[in-house]
């Protein structure tokens, strides 16, 4: 028993032990046709010992595609050296909860007093449930959709990029708020959702003065 004594002199050992296992599998397929049509497909599976066996694995796909219009034969706009349209969609999982065993009830050491003041109130070491578990806990999932365009002018000396994205995070892992009358720590739950949207713009210029090469850029989100 770790830290099982009622006072410091009775404790011969102190410490703790925790175990966590993670396993991941990942695969990717890329396709490139004549430098004009670009596709990529990814699939990953992650397993965490934080979850029960029926909730342990999460599968997260993603794919992206691009069309380099500037490589098409019909495209003949001399100042434009690069024009590419991009789109992507993908998912990722999160299992970082802070607790190593969130699906089971936690037990902690508590001292219990027996007797009265006349009996010197003998102090005994005991254990009691301190936190509720959640058997249905599963992976938090983030889904990102992105649409973008890349432009290059004058042999790509001047470049411009624009991206619009939507990021949805569902099943966010958080502790619930319980009334104090429950008397136990709140379990972790998949009960929150957040959506973020944004637009990223970037412009850059690169050149040289004799042997001096330089580049400048700016971005805004």
Cite the ranges covered by each PLM segment.
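Extracellular/periplasmic, surface-exposed regions of secreted and cell-surface proteins
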Residues: 1-221
């Amino acid at each position: 028993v770790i830290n099982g004594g009622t006072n410091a002199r009775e404790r011969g050992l102190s410490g703790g032990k925790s175990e966590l296992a993670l396993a991941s599998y990942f695969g990717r397929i890329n396709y490139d046709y004549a430098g004009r049509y670009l596709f990529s497909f990814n699939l990953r599976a992650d397993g965490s010992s934080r979850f029960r066996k029926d909730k342990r694995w999460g599968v997260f796909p993603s794919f992206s595609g691009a069309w380099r219009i500037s490589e098409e034969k019909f495209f003949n706009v001399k100042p434009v050296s690069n024009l590419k349209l991009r789109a992507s969609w993908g998912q990722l999982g999160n299992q970082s909860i802070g607790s190593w065993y969130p699906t089971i009830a936690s037990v902690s050491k508590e001292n219990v007093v027996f007797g009265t003041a006349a009996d010197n109130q003998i102090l005994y070491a005991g254990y009691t449930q301190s936190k509720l578990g959640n058997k249905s806990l599963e992976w938090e999932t983030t889904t990102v959709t992105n649409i973008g365009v890349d432009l290059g002018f004058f042999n790509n000396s001047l470049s411009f990029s624009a991206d619009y994205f939507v990021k949805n995070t569902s099943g966010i892992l958080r502790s619930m708020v319980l009334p104090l009358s429950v008397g136990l720590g709140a379990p972790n739950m998949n009960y929150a959702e957040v959506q973020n949207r944004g637009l990223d713009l970037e412009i850059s210029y690169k050149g040289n003065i004799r042997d001096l090469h330089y580049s400048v850029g700016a971005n805004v989100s």
